[in-house]
């Protein structure tokens, strides 16, 4: 059976989840799949830039992010002391005055993603479907200019069972493990 979805998102890393959360905020449902067995447990990138905190503010979750994170106020630069040790060579404010009303913060990426997943679910009940492998993506170029057409066919596999989705739009945020033909469309 073929399922129609407006937006199909391959990958539930930070980019995929952020895009899905934006869509959910505006009432657009999507199918978001990931090959992992569940949400990220250990972070791979924990720094959150000021502008990203602004995005979280637009989702209504900046307060929680700011409460849980370490705030970066200044940076320190270190150099070799010439004897096998290090010495502090300089310190500087972390961000330029007037850059943003939000700070630069540090929080485990798994927790950052969890904040986004919670917001996405709160906005429209949407969740990530884990354990999927995207096997193929095909675009019907004859229908691609019609914004109402489900012109992309995405073939997936989960637990040995093939599932096919027709989508108006596909967002690929996990190119590392994607089928070769996906990179043609990125």
Predicted regions and their residues:
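Conserved structural-core and active-site-/substrate-pathway-adjacent residues in large, well-folded domains
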Residues: 9, 20, 56, 113-116, ...
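Active-site-adjacent segment of FAD-dependent monooxygenases/related oxidoreductases
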Residues: 41-122, 129, 138-147
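A short, Lys/Arg-enriched amphipathic alpha-helix followed by its capping loop at the start of a domain
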Residues: 18-28, 122-123, 169
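Glycine-rich FAD pyrophosphate-binding loop
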Residues: 24-45
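Conserved beta-strand-loop-beta-strand element in the redox core of flavoprotein oxidoreductases
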Residues: 138-166, 170
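Conserved Rossmann-like nucleotide-cofactor binding loop
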Residues: 15, 38, 177
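Flavin (primarily FAD) binding-site architecture
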Residues: 172-186
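Beta1/beta-strand and adjacent pyrophosphate-binding region of the FAD-binding site
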Residues: 2-15
């Amino acid at each position: 059976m073929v399922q129609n979805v407006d937006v199909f998102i391959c990958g539930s890393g930070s980019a995929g989840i952020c895009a899905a959360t934006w869509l959910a905020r505006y009432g657009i449902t999507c199918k978001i799949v990931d090959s992992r067995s569940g949400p990220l447990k250990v972070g791979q990138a924990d720094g959150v830039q000021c502008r990203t905190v602004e995005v979280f503010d637009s989702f209504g979750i900046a307060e929680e992010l700011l409460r849980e994170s370490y705030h970066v106020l200044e940076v320190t630069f270190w150099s070799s002391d010439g004897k096998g040790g290090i010495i502090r060579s300089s310190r500087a404010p972390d961000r330029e005055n007037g850059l943003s009303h939000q700070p630069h913060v540090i929080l485990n990426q798994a927790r950052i993603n969890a904040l986004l997943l919670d917001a996405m679910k709160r906005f429209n009940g949407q969740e990530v479907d884990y354990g999927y492998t995207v096997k193929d993506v095909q675009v019907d170029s004859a229908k691609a200019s019609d914004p109402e057409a489900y012109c992309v066919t995405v073939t997936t596999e989960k637990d040995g069972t093939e599932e096919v989705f027709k989508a108006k739009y596909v967002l690929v945020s996990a190119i590392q493990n994607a089928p070769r033909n996906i990179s043609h469309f990125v």
